Amino acid sequence: LIEQLNSLNMSLIVTAYTQEGIVIGADSCITTNFTQEGKELYKHSHCGNKLFLLNKKIGISTCGDAIINGILLSSLIDQYIWSKKEENITLLQVEIDLKNIVNNQAKGKEYYVIFHICGYENGKRYVSKFDNNDKESHIKDVSERDGCIYDGQVDIVDLFSQDVAYRGTDGLYYDINIERCRYNELSLQETIEYVYFLISTTIQHMRFTYKKDNVGFPIDILVIMPNESLWLQKKELHIPGNY
């Protein structure tokens, strides 16, 4: 008897924006936690879709709850993208719509989904990081600054971007100097490699530790440029080679 079931894609999504374009990356792991006969168990899937392209110009990525009231979030987003394929939709409207999709499907139950959306409008570069419970818009014009946002299992990524200290034998804490990423100098190819590095390093770190494997291959990579977009890496339906 399964007493409780929760499906999370609390994995890792990364969106980096530099002079030549925006690069979005997402892993494919979905962790299902459940209680059976009083024991807490979990299962992994490495087929989760968390990265999407709307009308060849807007990138969407997700982490958090992967199943909303019995329906895969990826299925809900795919249906939404199909319904908007003929529309000249704005980032602001996408932000509003994604919140409504989750909250309407939730039917009063509590769910937590983080979204990244990004793209170009009127020659300007925009990114947004929000969750389904946010009441305000978080769209930011980042045309004049380069950087990176990330969500999900972020503890390893934090080591490359956040201030870190260690505790000495004297009980005092000492700062460790972090070499910041030179976002403003990165080419588009370097930005792609950087996003892939952050996600793949997190996956490999979990492999060699006792951490639960909440992040896993394959990694999907989407690139958005001012006048075009392209999938550099995207999972496809296939017959598994081991059968």
Where are these regions (language model features)?
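N-terminal nucleophile
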Residues: 5-243
